[in-house]
């Protein structure tokens, strides 16, 4: 398993409330939470335990309890028809067997302890024999609901914050919402306002309670999870962040405004009084209670890693745990990922905006967290990109249940992977840039579109290193032939993009004629959608050679020495002069003495200047002698190696002098190329592709080509995805 693979580990949802009469369980989903999710009908006994201790690894798959290490059924995980079969590695198998051994021993000890505890309970209380059947049907994983409610209804001080408790290797995670002392479910913006309206709110709350006859103090939507041990923190954190916290706050808002939870709880309790049979009761709850229907839909969607479109008090809300199908760099060989994932450095630029959930490139590593200050700028950059629909336009319109003649439907039909969103907004009279960005964000969130650079015949495309050739190729060959019967087959098309004998070339060389342009772009869109092809992009760094650094160093030394020489001369010539007014009688009486002093100062200044010139001459002689020796080049304030500027857009004073030396002295760029150079400067960080520069800046390909030829000795260029 890996962080890149969806694994919600959700096995159930509980709704707990607390009133004056105490906590109670209102609803649970799924209804049958009395067994382990993958528990077999048979149980461990002493003979089975003895057999497993002497057996080899071949019988480990007989015990589904071992699958808790990975949170899935082992039959499914290692089945050739299952997705995870194609993602396994040698390291996966070794760690799998080691963890199975540990879990097997734990299961053996647990089975023995469980039988002993059951025997002791029966021996101490014989009456439990007759009641075991009834209580077992209502228990939740062997725990009595009343006892579980006491643990899942925390005190008031522990509410309105994250709640997490582990019971029998299962995580009960939630955000308990408790009402405040003033009767409100939400904190007001000002404490003075709370104090001023406290009596009024309390009175109104008492009136509401008398009408509703349900004094609801707390409600808690609890998610039951069994994540893998090695993914424990990651899985519960993403569940709480993306689903639990947001859904609980939405429910708190509806309870505060409309008493939504209170009214639904009353309805559920009434239905429980009317219908005693479980199947009929469950059917009535789903048909009549919108809260039960919401919990049911949430469990089904989130447990299957789908988007949960929930109706909360007749308002549509969407929740999901994002799936990682976007990668900015190639994952390690031992890191599994979803087949068909997209590989592009553009993901790294937009990953900080929240639009894209970037995949992990290392095994169980931390998520990429580039703390860029330009997050809002990166979000604005989306208008320069294009959208690639991940399904047919009409199918998307039907799935998201929007009006066929609505603005969103028109926008979806307008989307073309060859045009940027900015061009779409200028081409449409009814859509501005903000609306286009908003619609794009929604389609990306709903997993209906992907951000790409606009397709162009001048761009270069090649077979992605993450192409699902080993998993989906044979199926996709038929699908590609069905969608594009007049084009070459899928393997042949991929061979055209990435030939063995030469480098990949522009996409225009693949298209036979102008008449084939549209169909070839459609085929290219299909290949990018399913992860077979990605764009080849150009990245550059600005290189500062040792020669440039020595010249700048010499300029700095010359400036420093000339500055010191001028300062000394000023001090010697002007330091003893006194321009203050004096008594004429005193001046006439001391003229001879002042003239003698001035003569002495001029002589001293002449001597000091001659000494300075002698010292400068001696320094020059030392430099000449050092140059003539073999150790001369090593005597420098700078390193011998060249320097690569990682962020020339934020260059220091010294780095700016290096850059100016390249522009004006070494390359002697014209004014037009100098302006183009300064536009290109912030893209010389090895992270921003030049193709993005062409999209954002008002600069032509010809001008870029001339500039790169002029400064080719001072740049390092790399081409990759």
Curated annotation (Swiss-Prot):
Q: Give residue spans, biased composition: Acidic residues.
A: 37-54
> Origin, by domain of life?
Eukaryota
User: Does RNA-binding show up as a keyword for this record?
Assistant: no
InterPro entries attached to this UniProt entry: HTH_NPRL3 (IPR056603), Npr3 (IPR005365)
Keywords of the record: Meiosis, Signal
User: Secretion signal: which residues?
Assistant: 1-21
The yes or no answer to whether the keyword Isomerase is present is: no
Q: Please give the residue ranges the record annotates as the region Disordered.
A: 27-54, 555-614
Gene Ontology process terms (BP): cellular response to amino acid starvation; meiotic cell cycle; negative regulation of TORC1 signaling; positive regulation of autophagy; TORC1 signaling
Task: Name a GO CC annotation attached to this entry.
Answer: GATOR1 complex
PANTHER family registered for this protein in UniProt:
CGTHBA PROTEIN -14 GENE PROTEIN (PTHR13153), GATOR COMPLEX PROTEIN NPRL3 (PTHR13153:SF5)
Assigned protein family:
Belongs to the NPR3 family.
Annotated function? Mediates inactivation of the TORC1 complex in response to amino acid starvation. Required for meiotic nuclear division.
Under what name is this protein listed?
Answer: Nitrogen permease regulator 3
Q: What is the lineage of its organism?
A: Eukaryota, Fungi, Dikarya, Ascomycota, Saccharomycotina
| Originating gene | NPR3
